[in-house]
């Protein structure tokens, strides 16, 4: 095992395997949540297989090439943007006007095409080390606001999935009924996860999902949870446990739509830019955070071999799109494995092996109901929202307003891209009108004019 330089990193095989297993337990919920979210617009089984394969291969590359204990999978928030904001939302305006419910039939294919191109662009940016420069050009308060906003957005989606928050014609949204078993079970699930996390139980999120699901099975058996497929209430009891079913993969793999993308290039570019920036913040922040916790940063606070790390993330994104899943990114849950002593790529390789093994249990993961995965979304959202505490509210409001707008607009507009646009544009405008235009970096000016052009196109109905 000298390949991983275990002695140099003061670790051993046993520790690395335990760490890799812990990381998997901490992030395995994505195998239930990603098919649940993307399954609203794609083949659910295909998404599951694509997620497991892309996660395994990307994590293997990270471990074998970069030799870092960082695992990758489909990013939360990015998958929600993929399914709800773009597929169901933004692309609807380009459907057939004669259709009472206009939409683009191949919306998810267009999104996969955008994710694939995003990965290629990231590869190019990684080669020329542009990604690091882009991140350094974005204000810290804005980064924190974006992360926190994604957290609120993810939590909101979770609450919708559990019927905690429902549509209301008078107030737009309202509180669901406590007579609904899904709502009650989801709240119990949140409590379970928090209690486990409080006691530092590794895999608290996964255990929370499984226990909530188990309670749902009991609820169905005793007749409290009523199955009603016509109203979207399905059985939570799987018909089998083991199955190497790859049939759904043919419904998702290599399903690109370059025709529409080229015919509507301005809109396609706008989608790519949104994916680019959201993925950029998530990846770099996660990588630095995990590296710092694992004491992998050098004396200058920089990450050695940052190139292979960021390139792996880019390769994973394009690979995931080819297989049929949303943006692949580094997972902050990798810190769970680091906390168990993981220091090398052997930790990542172990996690990758677990993702491959998970392929045999697809019926189990696909039977997990939304009310069982909702607690995970709500809890992970809380972890992300903590970034707002890093914003300097007591200092100059000109430094904080942009981050605040990003933070608040994401859930209210139900769009990550809109939140980023409001945040970045607000930051630049406030700086200019408070006489601090010199604080605006070249990167921020470029982004400002990109979003300004996008707004102009919407107003003039040019795109």
Each language-model region and where it sits:
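Membrane-interface helix caps of multi-pass small-molecule transporters
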Residues: 36, 60, 64, 85, ...
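Helix-loop-helix junctions within the multi-pass membrane cores of secondary transporters/permeases
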Residues: 1-34, 54, 75-150, 290-391
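Membrane-embedded alpha-helical modules
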Residues: 90, 104-214, 349-463
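Residue-level signature of catalytic and energy-coupling elements of molecular machines
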Residues: 17, 37, 134, 203, ...
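Loop-to-helix transition at the N-terminal end of transmembrane alpha-helices
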Residues: 42-60
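Helix-loop-helix hairpins and the membrane-proximal interhelical loops
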Residues: 1-47, 173-175, 209-307, 451-453, ...
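Juxtamembrane transmembrane-helix boundary signature
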Residues: 54-76
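Hydrophobic/aromatic residues within the transmembrane alpha-helices of Major Facilitator Superfamily
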Residues: 21-28, 57-60, 64, 159, ...
């Amino acid at each position: 095992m000298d390949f991983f330089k275990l002695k140099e990193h003061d670790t051993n095989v046993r520790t690395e395997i335990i760490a890799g297993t812990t990381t998997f337990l901490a992030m395995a919920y994505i195998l239930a949540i990603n098919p649940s979210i993307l399954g609203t617009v794609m083949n659910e089984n295909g998404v599951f297989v694509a997620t497991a394969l892309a996660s395994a291969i990307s994590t293997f590359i990270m471990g074998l090439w970069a030799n870092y204990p960082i695992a990758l999978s489909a990013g939360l928030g990015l998958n929600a943007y993929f399914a709800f904001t773009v597929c169901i939302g933004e692309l609807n305006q380009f459907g057939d006007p004669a259709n009472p419910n206009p939409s683009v039939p191949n919306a998810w294919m267009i999104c996969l095409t955008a994710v694939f191109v995003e990965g290629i662009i990231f590869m190019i940016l990684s080669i020329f080390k542009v990604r690091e420069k882009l991140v350094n050009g974005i204000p810290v308060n804005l980064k924190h606001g974006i992360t926190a906003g994604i957290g609120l957005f993810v939590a909101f989606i979770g609450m919708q999935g559990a019927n905690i928050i429902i549509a209301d014609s008078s107030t737009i949204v309202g509180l669901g009924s406590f007579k609904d078993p899904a709502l009650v079970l989801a709240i119990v699930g949140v409590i379970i996860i928090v209690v486990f996390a409080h006691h530092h139980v590794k895999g608290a999120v996964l255990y929370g999902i499984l226990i909530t699901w188990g309670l749902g099975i009991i609820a169905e058996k005793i007749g409290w949870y009523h199955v009603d497929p016509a109203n979207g209430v399905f059985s939570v009891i799987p018909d089998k446990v083991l199955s190497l079913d790859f049939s759904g993969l043919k419904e998702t793999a290599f399903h690109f739509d370059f025709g529409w993308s080229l015919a509507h290039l301005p809109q396609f570019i706008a989608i790519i830019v949104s994916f680019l920036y959201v993925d950029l913040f998530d990846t770099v922040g996660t990588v630095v955070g995990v590296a710092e916790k694992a004491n992998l940063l050098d004396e200058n606070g920089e990450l050695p071999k940052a190139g292979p790390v960021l390139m792996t993330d880019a390769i994973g994104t394009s690979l995931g799109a080819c297989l049929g899943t949303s943006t692949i990114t580094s997972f902050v849950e990798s810190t769970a494995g680091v906390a168990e002593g993981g220091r090398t790529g052997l930790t990542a390789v172990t996690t990758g092996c677990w993702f491959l093994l998970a392929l045999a249990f697809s019926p189990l993961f696909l039977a997990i109901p939304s009310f069982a995965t909702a607690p995970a979304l709500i809890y992970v959202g809380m972890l992300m929202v903590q970034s707002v505490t890093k914003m300097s509210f007591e200092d100059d409001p000109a430094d904080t307003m942009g981050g605040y707008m990003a933070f608040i607009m994401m859930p209210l507009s139900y769009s990550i891209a809109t939140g980023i646009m409001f945040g970045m544009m607000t930051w630049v405008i406030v700086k200019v009108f408070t006489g601090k235009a010199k604080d605006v970096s070249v990167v921020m000016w470029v982004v400002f004019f990109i979003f300004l052009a996008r707004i102009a196109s919407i107003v003039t109905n040019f795109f």
